[in-house]
Amino acid sequence: AGSLMTSTTADNLATALRLASSGFAVFPCQSGGPKAKQPMPFIKWREVSTTDQRQINLWWQKWPDAAIGLDLAKSNLIVIDADRHGEDDGVAAMGELMSERRYEPHGVPLAATPNEGTHFFYRQPEGKRLGNSKGALPAGVDVRGHGGYVIAPGTVMQDGRLYEVFGDIAEAPEM
């Protein structure tokens, strides 16, 4: 990478408000420490995630460093989460799966996660409520959907690492 990090966790509020104004439901998560990526204490995210700007401002006043949780059900999204952990390279596996199916991910928004993983964002297909699954796809690749959340693209973690964004949201392909 080698690029200079100019974003700070202070930008998370602006990012959360921008996501909310586009109709994506957000909530505050911890941006560092042993519970990084978990919802803030006493935040029942499935109940309280929102697009309400006033509520979002209140949360970030209370927790200015909060990471942004993205409620996938309320946001009508599915995320394919390809990780690199030890032996499992989900990013490579996902690339192979896509080329086997001759599926070109052009225009699919990707978020590069701080641990060299990739989140592929899709809209829920019309009339479906695809949930979370582990193990249906190759090792290192999970699906998060209805009932799940991810750290939102554009989020800066406490250590300065970024969930970097590329592209617009397409409908999920048949895999």
Language-model features, listed with the residues they occupy:
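Conserved phosphate/metal-binding and DNA-contacting active-site motifs used
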Residues: 1-175
